[in-house]
Curated annotation (Swiss-Prot):
Residues making up the signal peptide according to the UniProt record: none
GO molecular function: nickel cation binding; zinc ion binding
A Pfam family matched in the record: HypA
Binding site for Ni(2+): H2
Listed name of the protein: Hydrogenase maturation factor HypA
Gene that specifies this protein: hypA
InterPro entries: Hydgase_Ni_incorp_HypA/HybF_CS, HypA/HybF
GO biological process, one term: protein modification process
Keyword rRNA processing on entry: no
NCBIfam families xref list: hypA
Family indicated by similarity: Belongs to the HypA/HybF family.
Length: 114
């Protein structure tokens, strides 16, 4: 399960950028073609955040659908797997233009009290 290592890296990156403030929420974008299982990330998040500034934070995952572009006719095609056939010209030469990403889109931190 490579999601554990990925989640550990996410927690480390967010904690590093939190400047010792508590994190309330983390939003990730995970592409549906990325081979990353959002359910596993959610499970690992609870474990990996224990004892950190992220402990108790909410994890929000936005799934990004797969999208390919035909090299022959430039048609954009929705993809459920990292390959497919253009429904316009029947070419199998597709470039994946969306759906492989893993991004930390946003983090919400507790406000500093003065």
């Amino acid at each position: 399960m490579h999601e554990l290592g990925i989640t550990q890296n996410i927690v480390a990156i967010v904690a590093e950028n939190a400047n010792n403030r508590l994190i309330k929420r983390v939003t990730l974008e995970i592409g549906e073609l990325s081979a990353i299982m959002p359910n596993a990330i959610e499970f690992c998040f609870d474990v990996c955040t224990q004892g950190t500034v992220l402990e108790g934070a909410t994890l929000e995952i936005i799934k990004i659908p797969g999208l390919g572009k035909c090299r022959q006719c430039a048609t954009e095609i929705p993809l459920e797997q990292p390959f497919g056939i253009c429904h316009v010209c029947n070419s199998v030469e597709l470039d994946i233009i969306q759906g492989q990403e893993l991004k930390i889109k946003e983090m919400e931190v507790e406000e500093l009290s003065v």
